[in-house]
């Protein structure tokens, strides 16, 4: 059975539009930089290649999972959606997929902003770049007077220089 937003709402005992924040990280390993080899300005891993998964009934493209997340989000209608994915989504041919994601946010009624953040700038002893999407339902942005620039301003400034594992564990 396909999971619906209504299934989740029923399980939580709430109605569409009552969820404040929906946070998700749908896998998009086809766009991951892990193991990618750069040749002639392009990446040989991931971009344009289809990875598949099977739930025992059908086989689907793994990159379609982001749109499944957005399908469920449309049904739940949270005030804010936060989503995280690999930074490779913002590079080369994958950028078309990124645009498809942002267009889908807009089609389902959300104002969206995104930024690549590196965890090492936020006190994590690891360099891990991720694109973060913050989407606010249009009626909420109108009610509180948010604009695209206000949403973009939600992203935090980097607050630390990169730290090592030794730095992180030195006082334990």
Question: What is each of the regions a protein language model found here?
Answer:
Residues 1-6:
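SAM cofactor-binding core of SAM-dependent methyltransferases
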Residues 7-19, 29-172:
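Class I S-adenosyl-L-methionine
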